Amino acid sequence: MALEIDCSGRTALVTGGGNGVGAAICHALVAAGASVWVNDIIEDRATAVADSLGGAPHARPVKADVTSPEKIRRMREETGPVDILVNNAGIPTTGFGELKLFVDTAPEDWEAAMRLNLGAVLHVSHAYVGAMVDRGWGRVVTIVSDAGRRGERYQAIYGAAKAGAMGFMLSLAAEVGPSGVTANCVALASMRTGILADAVERDPAIGDRLARAYPMRRLGEPTDPAALVALLCSEGASWMTGQVYPVDGGYVSAL
């Protein structure tokens, strides 16, 4: 029997959906029958993804900075309640600057990464999950990182934020489960997106060196986690909750 991922009739919001993994998730959800709000801080990116999915009613762009509670409130007014929330928006390490050991950082180095990688998960979830509970159905998936599952140099702040997001989601699952709402995480490793994709394009040796850390001997592609996210958001995943599912090429092997 073929596995059917069915999100028909459901409305989803994907934060950070304007490129990379977020865009791939939007495509997977629409393919599974959902209609999707594509969120991004850059309106043109969100619009491009929505247009690539055929536009309304299949996909609509919604611009918002998800580190701002006020802009999240406005986004919630625009989208209305949703059935599916994918917390995907995030930034690497301590932002987009140079990698630093924790003892060499200053608090201002942490703030952007913590606001987006943890704070946005809390604020966006708070804005949307209550309506799921009231309606008796919902799916929440947060994209996290193996940096929150194992200790690595230069990852103290990023790892702390992602571990915090995981802890939040596990507790959320316990709270909202009786109302028919599930909450799960998908943990990624090095993905060929954004800054890393640009670096690998300039110097393929960077990708080769990183890939040696993975049993699959390659970096992740944006499409790798998308099907799993769609599955977790589907009707058939009603007994899958409170878990962290790795899509990491075997980078972290653990019970």
Question: Can you annotate each of these PLM segments?
Answer:
Residues M1-I5, F96-L99, R150, A230, ...:
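Short C-terminal tail/terminal secondary-structure segment
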Residues L3-W37:
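Canonical Rossmann dinucleotide-binding motif of NAD(H)/NADP(H)-dependent dehydrogenases/reductases
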Residues I91, V103-L122, W137, V141, ...:
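Catalytic Tyr-X3-Lys loop
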Residues S125, A161, M169:
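Active-site helix of classical SDR
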Residues S125, W137, R218-V247, V252-S253:
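C-terminal substrate-recognition "lid" of short-chain dehydrogenase/reductases
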Residues G130, A174-E175, S238:
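Alpha-helical segment proximal to the catalytic Tyr-Lys
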Residues S145:
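Residue(s) in the substrate-gating loop at a strand-loop-helix junction
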Residues G177, T182, M240-G242:
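Short, small/polar-rich loop/turn modules that mediate ligand/substrate recognition or access, typified
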